[in-house]
């Protein structure tokens, strides 16, 4: 089934206590860094006794943002609305999140606030956990970090909104909100009130379906379809767009399923209507394409009108006939002046209307953005030219006009924005490739009585339900996560796990949606669909990272907040400085243009300063790089959960490894068994296996597998494990009771009403079990050879010892050496005994070892290393590693590990390969280097270009930068930054053969 855009890491919002508010802030993986202050505000309100449980949160698409100043503008506009508690804006995603009190402010008011700020807004989507929904919205018009901050600020302060994140790179906003307090329309309105375009992309509501309907040819067809929907049981409400054929249906899932709903519509329409479930990515892609197309149309329109201006200004004066026509006086002006005025007016106020609208809304909201600079620069050129014409008509003194500067400036800015939209689209290529892994359709097998297959039909993959039996042809993609029920084949899982070798699949083998069936036909039963599917969760993690803000983004946000006022101030100084210089004779009149004045000469410098300055490049420097890097990481099997984690990893000083399952393969095998009692070997193994059958620890599974093989000479499963449930039902194991797993020690339970202990020395000591010297010597010999000695005591007496070996991963030693070459110090922290730990550490080349450490103690080790400000990474795979993963600055969970470990980590290594630890750190370093280069370019561009535009070098070079050329430079600067980030797509992960060439950075 096609993946959802959401992960399942959100918790319900119940409100009422500070702890609850704190929890919901902590689990919000998409929260940007400035959520903290808002959380404090809410906590303060709780302490004051004010109820915040009724707050609502909306997510809106904001159109019109072009730079960081825009997002700051939208955010400020929303924060100024009474009743808005929190707002956040993502510039690249054109998205805003708002938290507000519906008793004080309505969604329409928030939308109007964004529109009043000069942007268009539209509700995007909503998602439901238990008490909240999460909606995703497109936000059009964002161009820089200021736009993002503005939209985010508005959305976060909306009552009922729990979390809001807006991303510039994808023009998306995500809002988690209480649907009882605020709805999606209110969120869209908030975005539009901020001056951006917003629309709903998708919802995680289980009772909502968006369909594309083919077959609506006229009004009668639409009425027939509406009649069918009205009669269908379970349909609560629907909305049909008769022009686009898009149908949105809200239904009761307890009455009718989504597939039954689609089947019912098609059957009642007697085949006239064909319905297809619309993927949220499809809807989003169409919006992105539409925005780029709209920008292209604007550019072409402006270009078509600018070309005649160029001919009138440059070519025609050299052609006698045309020159005569242009200087022919028609009323108070010459024909050429009339033509230029008319053409430029269309460009200025029709094609360039968007700049005025966005600038006005931003200014009205007390903020500034790139649109303000463009509107100011073009208006100065246009209205000066109009004034010069009117002044000439009245006085007879004709000054030069600069209509062409205004027109060409708008044309070049539109070209730059079009190129920028294309470049930004490239940053999401990795996400698009992940989405395309899911097939559009699936073959559903229908069953008759007794489970006999009676037929098959093709259905939309988005309509697959858990329990469906599906047929997968050779070469086809697996349509959903599930289990093979018939057939055998090899499946290529490289696109999901990064593992290049095809994996054998037989009956009861799990399969992952989006992977490719290589050879034989398979029948599978779907188990996980929608947001539960592996591919969906991968996409959700990538999307989460792309929506988040890296801490380094704070710099761009600060600069964006002061950028435009500083530029306007510099432009005024330029105008005044050159004007005064001319008045006092500081420069010769020969510098002036023909028929020009000192004011005109100064004005051109001032306009160039205004239009050459570019806040967009700064706003795009970080989010575009983060977006590309997270996508590249996903394609290489490294899932990064956020910009914060991506940034922290570049300065990792220590990497802490767990031993079992991390440095080792996690495929423990029993190599030695020695009985120190009157029991025979079979009795002993049955006793130990019975005790360990209830444990999920790798060592326990190894013991059970060994005992089974001893009794039945059976082969274990492919991964060295056996099915404990089957073992318990097989009859050869003894009944147990009072089972307890003791982390860091072992297990204990009752067998035949007698206590059995299986574990290490600590467990024996705590239970007063004496270990004779000859047994201790035997255990020490095992440990010194790198094996784990498991001691067994029964009914108060030691009865035997088992030696278990867990082979090291083949790449472990090389990865450790690679980390040392990178300037990173590896440390092994394990709950195993010191002798085994030292033996394993020596084999892989780790000098710093911490053994016999309890799970909570691992977190203490990390905190001790963090005391001097060092950045610590933790690599683990088990539940007992989750406290350490959470305590580390950068937690890395092995993908084959437990869900708890993956949940606590910042990175997920899908391949279960330690080589990806180096990839994660190396990718982080490359990304931060690229971000710094982007900032250097963006800052250097403004630092160098503004003085040039102001004429600082004019006395030496005698070259004045025309306003249109300044506008072209400005437009191309942001495109250059995006293209710089796109270079990260060429990233190649370090290979085992080259990893040792990595040097310290």
Swiss-Prot record:
It is found in: Membrane. The keyword NAD does not apply. Belongs to the cation transport ATPase (P-type) (TC 3.A.3) family. Type IB subfamily. Mg(2+) binds at residues 877, 881. It catalyses: Cu(+)(in) + ATP + H2O = Cu(+)(out) + ADP + phosphate + H(+). One of its GO terms (molecular function) is copper ion binding. Residues 321-338, 387-403, 582-602, 952-963 are extracellular. It comes from Arabidopsis thaliana (Mouse-ear cress). Cu(+) 1 binds at residues 67, 70. Residues 56-122, 133-199, 207-273 form the HMA domain. This is Copper-transporting ATPase RAN1. Its main location: membrane.
